[in-house]
Amino acid sequence: MLDKRIVDVRLDQLEILKAKNGKEHFEKQYTMGNLLGSGGFGSVYSGHRISDGQKVAIKQISRDRIQQWSKMPGEVNPVPNEIALLQSLGGGSGSVPGHRGIIRMLDWFEIPGQEYLIVFEKPQHCQDLFDFITERGALDESLARRFLKQVIEAVQFCHSKGIVHRDIKDENILVDTRTGDIKVIDFGSGATLKDSMYTDFEGTRVYSPPEWILYHKYHALPLTVWSLGVLLYDMVCGDIPFEQDTDIVKAKPSFNKRISNDCRSLICSCLSYNPGDRPSLEQILQHPWMMESSVDNGDLQEESKIKPSL
């Protein structure tokens, strides 16, 4: 387990949304409903805002599960790093505009000595990409291309704000099953973006690159590109390329599905063993496979018969 530490996040010129201490303040504004999911990060519940009935998702995190803390202007005590990152990406009442491809934090509350509650928008007709692939199987390349482009654009926005997600995977991507629009979720493993090496990692191991498995260090951009390569393989082949550490460090995916040469080329490029050989995000977007046309909204609506899980 990582040592608990305070991570300073630059949030200058933001109007910071301040926590309303105590559960009674939360209960005056929101109603918590059924459990949607749980894991090492905590639990997520459905809910709604009392003032207007807006549906929301509420993430409940116990204090003892929080590994990274941040100082925020206007707050006396450090807050969970995830809250600071989401605030700088346009969450709450801050002045920074958000991005359509990133889930928006609406509010947050501290229950002193116990937990934090983070309130998110709850897009309708959505399910995570993991379930989307599980129910549908391997995706057509045109649909995978469309999803990947949106994920990259969301990641680029994060990087422009000095933030790296560090846990890009199918479970952290919501798909609107009517329109094909996506939103990146769960910044619990995120960090401030820096040029130097990282020596901590709280993301998903099967999406992590060889340099982390072997040396427990990595740079943010090659790590992100590796995870995008795993994600693309997952979408077009129906499952992730590597399950074991020994396979990750070999960096040689096997293709059990018939996919185009250009798609295979992009996957292998992103999954290069040497971090320096991996493309940049801009180079991925300019790859011949990415330049091909994708399905439009109508095509997705016609094909999708999946019942949304959220």
Curated annotation (Swiss-Prot):
Q: Which residues bind ATP?
A: L36, G37, S38, G39, G40, F41, G42, S43, V44, K59
- Residues annotated as catalytic: D167
Q: PROSITE patterns of this UniProt entry? A: PROTEIN_KINASE_ATP, PROTEIN_KINASE_DOM, PROTEIN_KINASE_ST
* Residues in Protein kinase domain copies: 30-290
**What's any one GO cellular component for it?**
cytoplasm
- List its EC numbers: 2.7.11.1
Which post-translational modifications are recorded for this protein? Autophosphorylated.
Q: Which example biological process does GO assign this protein?
A: positive regulation of TORC1 signaling
- Catalytic activity, per the record? L-seryl-[protein] + ATP = O-phospho-L-seryl-[protein] + ADP + H(+); L-threonyl-[protein] + ATP = O-phospho-L-threonyl-[protein] + ADP + H(+)
Listed InterPro entries: Kinase-like_dom_sf (IPR011009), PIM1/2/3 (IPR017348), PIM_Ser/Thr_kinase (IPR051138), Prot_kinase_dom (IPR000719), Protein_kinase_ATP_BS (IPR017441), Ser/Thr_kinase_AS (IPR008271)
Q: Which Pfam families match?
A: Pkinase (PF00069)
What keywords are annotated for this sequence in UniProt? Answer: Apoptosis, ATP-binding, Kinase, Nucleotide-binding, Phosphoprotein, Proto-oncogene, Serine/threonine-protein kinase, Transferase
What are this entry's molecular-function GO terms? ATP binding; protein serine kinase activity; protein serine/threonine kinase activity
- What does the record give as the function of this protein? Proto-oncogene with serine/threonine kinase activity involved in cell survival and cell proliferation.
| Similarity-based family | Belongs to the protein kinase superfamily. CAMK Ser/Thr protein kinase family. PIM subfamily.
Specify the protein name. Serine/threonine-protein kinase pim-2
Q: Which organism is it from?
A: Danio rerio
Task: Name the gene for this chain.
Answer: pim2
